[in-house]
């Protein structure tokens, strides 16, 4: 569809209104749900747990854009020892994604979550239960224990809580990133630089909520 000047102006204005509403909803959601976003005991924190800036990532192990962005997140915490990276499973791409998210969360007590998380993104092909358990076994995790504990109500509850939180924040898809109290576009191109710039901005201007 080709728009005339008036039509184009109307479309741009409508997009601006929608964007403003989305941003306003997210900012309200962040203020109301800061504790769940930044300090939920069910979310794994990589990097420096006591860091001065929180970066939050909502992701699905079968999301190609999440896969592309994962190295930038790893690079960020490797290069900045004061960043705390809060990882939130948000499986939206089917049963495989949900099962793998459950396995990943069940690995936290065994102390190998981050290694499993990174391998799930670096190994080619779709993330499935079989692949997740194979990787877990290669990392020395007790897979029988994983299969049992992934069914615990706390694991399913953590995923349900992430879904509810995402809805409250107006998250419309994955990946979804936040640095401090503001969203960062999930586009893979330039993600690392965008994260670094936003981290620097938070350090300079602070965060409107307890991040």
PLM regions: where:
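C-terminal cap of thioredoxin/glutaredoxin-like
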Residues: 1-18, 134-211
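Ser/Thr/Pro/Gly-rich low-complexity linker/stalk segments immediately outside membranes or between
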Residues: 19-35
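Structural alpha/beta surface segment adjacent to cysteine/selenocysteine redox centers
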Residues: 51-62, 67-137, 142, 147, ...
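Hydrophobic alpha-helical segments typical of transmembrane helices
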Residues: 41-42, 72, 131, 162
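Short gly/ser/thr-rich secondary-structure transition/capping motifs
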Residues: 35-41, 158-160
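Short, flexible loop segments at the rims of nucleotide/cofactor-binding pockets, characterized by
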Residues: 33-34, 64, 154-155
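Conserved strand-loop elements at the edges of beta-sheets that form or border functional pockets
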Residues: 48, 57, 186
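Short beta-strand-to-loop junctions in surface cap/lid or active-site-entrance loops
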Residues: 43-51
């Amino acid at each position: 569809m080709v728009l005339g000047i008036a039509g184009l102006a109307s479309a741009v204005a409508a997009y601006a209104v929608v964007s403003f509403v989305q941003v306003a909803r997210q900012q309200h959601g962040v203020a109301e749900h800061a504790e769940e976003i930044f300090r939920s005991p069910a979310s794994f924190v990589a990097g420096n747990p006591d860091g001065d800036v929180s970066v939050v990532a909502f992701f699905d192990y079968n999301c190609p854009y999440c896969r592309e962005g994962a190295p930038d997140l790893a690079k960020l915490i490797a290069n900045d020892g004061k960043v705390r990276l809060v990882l939130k499973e948000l499986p939206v791409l089917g049963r495989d994604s949900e099962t793998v998210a459950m396995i990943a969360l069940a690995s936290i007590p065994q102390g190998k979550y981050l290694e499993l998380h990174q391998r799930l993104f670096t190994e080619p092909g779709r993330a499935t239960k079989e692949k997740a358990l194979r990787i877990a076994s290669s990392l020395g995790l007790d897979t029988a224990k994983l299969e049992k504990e992934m069914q615990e109500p706390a694991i399913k509850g953590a995923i349900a809580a992430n879904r509810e939180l995402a809805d409250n924040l107006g998250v419309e898809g994955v990946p979804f990133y936040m640095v401090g109290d503001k969203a960062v576009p999930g586009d893979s191109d330039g993600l690392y630089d965008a994260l670094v710039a936003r981290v620097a901005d938070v350090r300079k201007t602070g965060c409107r909520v307890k991040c």
